[in-house]
């Protein structure tokens, strides 16, 4: 099973916020996931990024690949070099 760390869109129409989730790459964007590891709200000033640091590090250590957008968020949160 190939697993990715990616964004799941939540919120009202035109007012998106996102959950950072670990999911099978074959699942649809807003479909089934394994675990919620964080939250991202681009609409606040400054944008809100909340991550469960221990769980993110665990999933990265077992080989989960983050998507490009999640990789940018992890860099902003100083969790990736």
From Swiss-Prot:
Keywords: Ribonucleoprotein, Ribosomal protein. The gene is rpsP. One of its GO terms (molecular function) is structural constituent of ribosome. NCBIfam families: S16. The keyword Ribosomal protein applies. The keyword Ribonucleoprotein applies. HAMAP family: Ribosomal_bS16 (MF_00385). One of its GO terms (biological process) is translation. Pfam families: Ribosomal_S16 (PF00886). InterPro entries: Ribosomal_bS16, Ribosomal_bS16_dom_sf. Belongs to the bacterial ribosomal protein bS16 family. One of its GO terms (cellular component) is cytoplasm. It comes from the Bacteria. This is Small ribosomal subunit protein bS16.
């Amino acid at each position: 099973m190939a697993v990715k760390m990616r964004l799941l869109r939540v919120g009202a129409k035109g007012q998106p916020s996102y959950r950072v989730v670990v999911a099978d790459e074959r699942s649809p964007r807003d479909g089934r996931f394994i675990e919620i590891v964080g939250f991202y709200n681009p609409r606040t000033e400054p944008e809100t990024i909340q991550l469960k640091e221990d769980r993110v590090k665990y999933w990265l250590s077992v080989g989960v690949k983050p998507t490009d957008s999640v990789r940018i968020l992890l860099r902003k949160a100083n969790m990736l070099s």
